[in-house]
Amino acid sequence: MKNKGAKQKLKRKGAASAFGCDLTEYLESSGQDVPYVLKSCAEFIETHGIVDGIYRLSGVTSNIQRLRQEFGSDQCPDLTREVYLQDIHCVGSLCKLYFRELPNPLLTYELYEKFTEAVSHCPEEGQLARIQNVIQELPPSHYRTLEYLIRHLAHIASFSSKTNMHARNLALVWAPNLLRSKEIEATGCNGDAAFLAVRVQQVVIEFILNHVDQIFNNGAPGSLENDENRPIMKSLTLPALSLPMKLVSLEEAQARSLATNHPARKERRENSLPEIVPPMGTLFHTVLELPDNKRKLSSKSKKWKSIFNLGRSGSDSKSKLSRNGSVFVRGQRLSVEKATIRPAKSMDSLCSVPVEGKETKGNFNRTVTTGGFFIPATKMHSTGTGSSCDLTKQEGEWGQEGMPPGAEGGFDVSSDRSHLQGAQARPPPEQLKVFRPVEDPESEQTAPKMLGMFYTSNDSPSKSVFTSSLFQMEPSPRNQRKALNISEPFAVSVPLRVSAVISTNSTPCRTPPKELQSLSSLEEFSFHGSESGGWPEEEKPLGAETSAASVPKKAGLEDAKAVPEAPGTVECSKGLSQEPGAHLEEKKTPESSLSSQHLNELEKRPNPEKVVEEGREAGEMESSTLQESPRARAEAVLLHEMDEDDLANALIWPEIQQELKIIESEEELSSLPPPALKTSPIQPILESSLGPFIPSEPPGSLPCGSFPAPVSTPLEVWTRDPANQSTQGASTAASREKPEPEQGLHPDLASLAPLEIVPFEKASPQATVEVGGPGNLSPPLPPAPPPPTPLEESTPVLLSKGGPEREDSSRKLRTDLYIDQLKSQDSPEISSLCQGEEATPRHSDKQNSKNAASEGKGCGFPSPTREVEIVSQEEEDVTHSVQEPSDCDEDDTVTDIAQHGLEMVEPWEEPQWVTSPLHSPTLKDAHKAQVQGLQGHQLEKRLSHRPSLRQSHSLDSKPTVKSQWTLEVPSSSSCANLETERNSDPLQPQAPRREITGWDEKALRSFREFSGLKGAEAPPNQKGPSGVQPNPAETSPISLAEGKELGTHLGHSSPQIRQGGVPGPESSKESSPSVQDSTSPGEHPAKLQLKSTECGPPKGKNRPSSLNLDPAIPIADLFWFENVASFSSPGMQVSEPGDPKVTWMTSSYCKADPWRVYSQDPQDLDIVAHALTGRRNSAPVSVSAVRTSFMVKMCQARAVPVIPPKIQYTQIPQPLPSQSSGENGVQPLERSQEGPSSTSGTTQKPAKDDSPSSLESSKEEKPKQDPGAIKSSPVDATAPCMCEGPTLSPEPGSSNLLSTQDAVVQCRKRMSETEPSGDNLLSSKLERPSGGSKPFHRSRPGRPQSLILFSPPFPIMDHLPPSSTVTDSKVLLSPIRSPTQTVSPGLLCGELAENTWVTPEGVTLRNKMTIPKNGQRLETSTSCFYQPQRRSVILDGRSGRQIE
């Protein structure tokens, strides 16, 4: 106070120098330590200002002006006057005004970049040290003032219970007054950039507020200034004591600053300027990039400024949502190109962080800094992608994700993960970033899947759309934006705080625990929502873990799955992204190791490590084989690193990155990108798939998320596998560990029934089946790449070991392996899907179809060689990307091997068996079928995932596999749905495949877990509501049954199954019987035996049998299927995998017979496959499958309600019998029949077939849908989950439903319109009218209103529309898609599912869905828009945000 007089005099002389006067000069002249305005206001507020909203609410302007004048005059205002006591907020406003008017902000311009950079570092300790160092660089006067102010604010924050102004809120209102960026001010970006900047600034201030004691506890201004600062402070203070001194001080200050003679002056000046300047140089060296980016941002901001400024600059809340919708979308379009988006993400992160509970400022900061303004390097690295780069760098996997575009090889922006990033850095990473920050490590881990779901489902649809549109049209962020608008925003916001708002998130959130898990997944990952369907059952027990655990679980699942599948995943990853292929490989290599390790760990737990080891060997061998690209390895390493560090983030981001990558890969896809695409889509798919379904995870984990998911997977597997094994492990570990923890997990698994059911019910069988299924798949892969001796050797070893042992330990191992394979399969599938997706964008039609087929076969194709598979896949898919082959093969091979290239030995030797029947539609399909025959196991293992996807793409090629998986998906509607979402996530084309894969995987897993469920449900699936499960049941049962029954001859059986799986019809049929058997355990065994017997012959030559099993057997199988369908009534309920109840039912069913049924199934599957081959050719089945899928999906949520709907599809009932009676005769029926059981497969098949005969499929889809609707209705519910997933993959939930139909329709359509698929994002909206038109027409004729109504209610549609511009394309198949969507939403959101499950008829559910959906989710509005979206696809496409 002794300075008071001096200050007043000073004021007199300086005339109101307090306001707008340089702080240092003012304090020197006034001789005060801190500004009098601050001191008096702070003291007054601490005494009288502990009121609600202090510092947030503004005082009366006249009072503020009066106070300012008084402070400017000699008199020190008496703040205790009544006028001020009544308007306390004017004092707080004045205090903020003072700092706002400082010429140089309190945290100076020079240090702005340093501050933002400091908080961008992940570890809090690192942040603290950095912030401390930067604060020490502040001029002493600024330092003292900051310390005083921060301590005051921290004190006020302690009264947050009264004021509601906690540290974050205070930081938010104070940050703009304390931190200002010259660049932003100079650019005059008041909108987007400024708003984003506020987010970053808030993080800085909040961090300081939360660490005030640590930061200011040195007692001295700074360590550097510590010694001299005090003297400096004294010298400042002393000179200030006297006016003369003060005056001299001012002059001295200038003179000294020039001469820097005065130690104090020198020190102070040095700190404020010299030191700051050098730091500035350093800072700007780093920051210069940022500024550069910012400038870009600014310039772009200027362009967008009007948009941002419209409602952006001032609307924080809007900004958050907008960020999701508008900023984010803009960010996506621009974000890739402008740093602003990053900030948007940062803001989102900030927003999200609160949701996350501000988990880690590091994380948030990282996001903000890396994602926000701190993207200098990243942004610099890639204009739009740069943002993602930084995040990547920080998150460690952003690089991977961000790199995908052109950074494939050289995007080393993030030097840390730059090589990875280079390959995967992508614009979407921004989203990812936002998401990631939102998700945080744990969440993020799942988030990647969720992202895959949101990003993939939403984003994935958007990415699918992205992958399609973006992939194909990747260059234009517009497409991205378009997809992003709807899906991206969801992806971004949805993760946490918006998740509730966002329909997918909302719905899942609202959804019951099972759905909650889904939600958590959804929340974190759209796909999670998708996965939620599967998860609820699988993960339901972990309801508590839903959000965090769900994500972790998901991650864990992912881990478990990824780990078990790690080799597969790695392989898949590798195969998945060739461009990322290298990355995948790299990832695969480490991941392979990691995966193997985890697998070992996981499988070790579940079973002998040897299988895992074998798998790992195979995986590693494959890894080696697949390590075609060092980058893959590097990525793998990075993945590994990420695994440890950013596993969660990596998981989330990589998927997004991969999605991003996919996007770009798709563009590059033709040659290299296909794998990248594959990776990308796969990641979304994988993640999404993973998220949605455990198998989903492999896709997320494997292909795209290969590194993320796998990394996450391994990590999570380790952490979650044991801990979350019940949840995640339940799914993954359960599947994997199931053998071991099966019983233990089973209770959980009961809830996790889908997953556990199989393991529990068939701990051994499941393991066997899983191993078998996966093994079969896996072997097919090794056979596919017989040349790759490692693979082959690994496979044989695995087979050898797996064969006999597999049955027992292999059962567990198999479970693990299967899961691994599931993962792997899914991965491969996803890989395939991704590949297909990549190809899809590139060769939308051909690739989708062929990629699917190729991939499906590719999995099988690897028989000749990975190249073969790839060739088949890529050739067909992408004309032949060596990378694809590598990718596909890698995926397949590695996956298979990782999955224990089991059984591949036998099937491998029977390549001839794997004839076209499996993929009869295409030579490639045939070839693949052969390969699959050989690789039946691998394929079954791998193909089960990949083939599903593949079939999705090449409807012919892998309908069955898809069917299988689909069945599995139906098994857990949630799973299916989730998977569908996951599938839908990657891309529409890929979506079909991927979704199917995801679904398949999910289905498979679910199925395995649900084996009974599936068995029980599969019949229902076939029958109707249960039909959903039948498909999975069909697939899974076959796989499982095969695995179980064929545990010994898993190699054959699995191949058959897979083969069957590959041929959707066969799978369906087989599944049908399986389902039947499952449904009635007694019958099931008998049937199983029958089937087994039927399958028995083919078992040795499962593939050949299935290939050769012509309509005759397929018909019989169909009859079996029909019977199963009949049985499916009970199973139907089981079929409600989404519901724990169903899961449990399935569980019981599954526990004994499902596997047997599966055993039977393999043959049946083969038969079906054979029949399916023809049927695959018929699009109608696909349509039916789609429709059915849609229904089934609906049914899944409410299996029972679905049955009546099945009747609603009375048109279909006829086909049902027909299908039943003459599956081979009525391939369409078969398809239809399969529609229920093979709906997924069918749908996927149609999806694949669709690509060749997109229109045909579309046309037939409708007719088929009618037949399929009834029979396939339930199944189709599944199929839709799967198919829709693939087709609608863009739309996670809706996508699933739609995906099935759309997948079938759109998938076919996509197959044919695969390019549009790539384009579909944009095109999809347009295509939705066109391509969707046909499905729409079909739907309309079938149940126009029903379907239409359905779609609006489904948030999935929302998800899908936003993220599925591509899906929108599918949405074009609005009617079908709608139903699919309905299913998907059901799956996605248990709540919706419940509401929607009735939808199987398509009407009831839809009506329910519509209302609940609207009420349930914000997306509902989008869903409501959905119909319009379908119609106004363009609207959605051009402004994806519009739907929002």
UniProtKB/Swiss-Prot annotation:
GO terms for molecular function: GTPase activator activity; SH3 domain binding. Residues 21-216 form the Rho-GAP domain. It comes from the Eukaryota. Residues 515-534, 1064-1075 have a biased composition (Low complexity). SMART domains: RhoGAP. The modification Phosphothreonine is found at residues 286, 679, 789. SUPFAM superfamilies: GTPase activation domain, GAP. Residues 777-790 have a biased composition (Pro residues). Signal peptide: none annotated. Residues 600-619, 735-745, 803-817, 839-848, 992-1008, 1246-1265 have a biased composition (Basic and acidic residues). CDD domains: RhoGAP_CdGAP. The record marks 56 as: Arginine finger. Coiled coil: none annotated. PROSITE patterns: RHOGAP. It is found in: Cell projection, Lamellipodium; Cell junction, Focal adhesion. One of its GO terms (cellular component) is cytosol. Keywords: Cell junction, Cell projection, GTPase activation, Phosphoprotein. Interacts with ITSN1, which inhibits GAP activity. Interacts with PARVA. Interacts with GTP-loaded RHOU. PANTHER family: CDC42 GTPASE-ACTIVATING PROTEIN, RHO GTPASE-ACTIVATING PROTEIN 31. It is linked to Adams-Oliver syndrome 1: A disorder characterized by the congenital absence of skin (aplasia cutis congenita) in combination with transverse limb defects. Aplasia cutis congenita can be located anywhere on the body, but in the vast majority of the cases, it is present on the posterior parietal region where it is often associated with an underlying defect of the parietal bones. Limb abnormalities are typically limb truncation defects affecting the distal phalanges or entire digits (true ectrodactyly). Only rarely, metatarsals/metacarpals or more proximal limb structures are also affected. This is Rho GTPase-activating protein 31. It comes from Homo sapiens (Human).
